[in-house]
Amino acid sequence: MNIEKADYGTIIRFGTMQDLNTKLQMEGKTLDEVIDVTDKEGVSLLEESLIARKFDIAKVLLANNAKVNNISHEGCNEFHFIASNINQDGALDIAKILLDRGTSLMVKDKKYGNSAFFTLCQEIFKVRSVEGLNFLETCFESVQEYDTCNKAGYSIRMLINERGTDKLKQMMESRT
């Protein structure tokens, strides 16, 4: 990769933190100056790091106060982007930071109408790790609505009733 020609998102996606630091030095910029840059699709550098499973970079960006709740042109926020990698080492640590920072679980993507929480549930239910299921239980406290259907006609309630744990079902029923 030609660091000189590559944009910051490309460097994050295909490079290392060292490559990003090299690019910043070459341009005479600081991380604070570019931390919230988005690409033509509205995807932030933090989101690029989540897509690429560069959780070490995500941790640095979050430690330097990268903006959360960035919504891409497709309607996705950070939880949508980390969801497909949520079962990878280090992903839940980042997801917990995102939750603590107030990243919305209810933002819906434009393509499917899936909330960030729905998307996380889909992926965590595939592996069903204790840590992942515990994270969903923690998230559930911030879920305001679970009966609205996505474009395929499925709701969070339906997903939890079909594939969720008994504890998630109990949590949901205790709120109705």
What are these regions (language model features)?
Residues 14-21:
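Helix-turn-helix repeat elements of alpha-solenoid scaffolds
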Residues 24-34, 59-67, 96-105, 134-146, ...:
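Ankyrin repeat domain, specifically the short helix-to-loop turn at the C-terminus of the second helix
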Residues 19, 56-57, 90, 94, ...:
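Conserved ankyrin/ankyrin-like repeat signature
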Residues 145-176:
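Leucine-rich solenoid repeat scaffolds
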Residues 2-10, 33-48, 71-84, 108-123, ...:
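Ankyrin-repeat boundary/"N-cap" motif
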Residues 106, 112-145:
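Conserved binding-pocket/active-site segment within a compact domain
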